[in-house]
Amino acid sequence: MRDGTTRVNTTGMRLKTITDVLIKLSQSSTHYDSAIFTSHKVKKFNLTTNENEPIEIWVYDDTSSSFPILTEYLKKHLESLIAAANHIFNRNEQLKKHWHETLVYIKKALEERLKFNIDLKQARKLVRDLINEIGFFWINQQPTMITTASQLYKGFLTKLFEAVEIAIPDYKRNHILVIQQTGDIIKCEYYERGTSRSLRSNVENALIEYRFAENTHESEKTKDFPSAHYRGKLGLCNVATCFSATFDANNETTSCKIYYRHASFPPIDLYPLYRQERKELKNTKQRYLKKKNEMEEGGKAMVNWQNRAFKTQQCREGIKLITTRNMEMLRDLMRKNRSELELLPAERPPLIYTNISLLTVKQWMDKDFQEEQYHDTILAAERLRSRGNRENEDKFVPIMFNFGVNLQAKWQRRKSWWRPSLPKEQVFENDRAFFKFNHLVIERLQLIASKKTFSFAKTQALPHLWELNEIASSWNRYEKTLDCLANAYDAACNNYEKDPSKENIEYLQECEEKLSQAKKNLWKVADTHIAFYRKDFKQLIANRSNFSNDDSELQAILKDWKMFNSLYLRDAWHDASFSIQTSIGNLTRVVGSELSINCKSADDRTTGFCRRFEGSEEGKDASSPHVRNDTDGGSIKFTGWAKTKKAKAIAKTEKKIAEAFSTHKLKKAVVAKSKIPTSHSLISSSSFWKLKAPDTSPFLTTNLPHSLSG
């Protein structure tokens, strides 16, 4: 043809595989020798199999090319990318807009970066930057797993730009780039011409040769290409069968491998499977045809395939080899019944969750997830709500909160503070992750409850608040629930002022009752955790049988205490109530390098845990908003609303802690730095200061209507 394109029509020929197509192509020696390897331009072969499936093969020979040719090369391949992408996206109206935006960006990046000549070093850097800018794109045609634009064509563009980088002239070798289009699927592969490696048809060596051309010398020395070299590069491959072909060019043997996949075949992550299941993968095509027939009968074969392919431990481990940006997302989703899940990219780009429905989220949350999955689940649910589906809010919020309540109950049944089968650090990490989830639920509820005229606050928010508060009684997380209850009460007061109806009065009284009960629960939690805290710290000391006043012994004990405090108490207890924060703060507050326990008498201990700061100005500052340093002796005294019977009981607990120290003759201790956060505590929360002292009307704000204030 005049444009230099050779078109081979194989219609009517009995070609069983794509291998036959390539062999037929190799027999056309005139076209092969003159049109491809003697030219410095890109050539395209349009082939058609006996199934009338179009296949485009593009071959590029780099013998003495310059960078401007690469520009033309990229643009030509971009046309194929655009054509196939449009074909896919036109089927889905939701993705049309997103694909257009991505397409404009790709065009702009190519035009700006490839319109002028640059030297070799700059060219390599340019290609790397281009890969990073555009990102990895991945085709996925599963109907229930439509991904976002940032993931489409991941494999295609990755291989395309890597091929460009390899084709830069300083490699001094000829390379073949093959782009194959089968229906909606485009595959791009490159191989080095003239290598001595024998042709192999199994998937294992196809993956090895995938990166072979990039580092030839290293590959020739080590027959098996080091897996670490292409770790994270493969990603998920839409591959069912690997075909091989050989054809002679200029008396050199060239290997060409083409990955072929039917559009409806499920994606397989070949990397974790090719070692353990390579024998099985040789028969992938036969197994696929069998599964396809079964699927036409019952529709269950594809689900069975996915369950078997993704539930294995080898595959979950292989997920770690994928690019960092998708690793966390994929790790949580490689579970059974994967076809019912949506993909959750870790970076959560703006286009995320375009295909999630309310029903999908509900089904999602009803499943028996592993513990580490709750966080992404709740984020997905929140993204769905914030995507503009305001009309679904009344339905959506109860689903989310029910999921939270059920999950907390599940954790409560399974959790133990010191699980013997797990290291302490892992238990602490799990607890911290759980509390993050609890905050997400409560913050969302707080927003709902603060709406002045939102009917959901009356019918659903308060019951959910109370359920969360009851569960939180054993999870040391009251400050957020109390904030929510206070905001709900404020909203009830405002509603009553606007409309003093019977319904609003009942709702207001219910809020007041719940708020008062929540305060009682707070004191109960404080007592429980103070006792637990004292017991565990005593145990830390008791474990040191040969305890002495030697500094090394003290440092060893306090090192254990630092771990115990920083990993557990700081995150899990400090925000529970003022009493926990006070008792821990008195022990772990950093004041220079030393903490001197200087209790003059037993009476001093009744007012608080005695301490004196030596050589530090920090001793003059209050350790928390509700306590202050007494200048005569350095003891801590409670002020304001903390002067209650409950505070005195807590002071007695602190006295016992002090006695535990004096029993072991602790006079000086080098305390490791451990900052105690107060910004999130109940004491520092704005809603707390709205609440009156216990000796007055319990937990009522100044906005209380006169008819209810007594």
Swiss-Prot record:
Protein name: Uncharacterized protein CBU_0041
Natural source organism: Coxiella burnetii (strain RSA 493 / Nine Mile phase I)
Coiled-coil regions listed in the entry: 273-298, 477-528
Keywords: Coiled coil
GO biological process: symbiont-mediated perturbation of host actin cytoskeleton via filamentous actin depolymerization
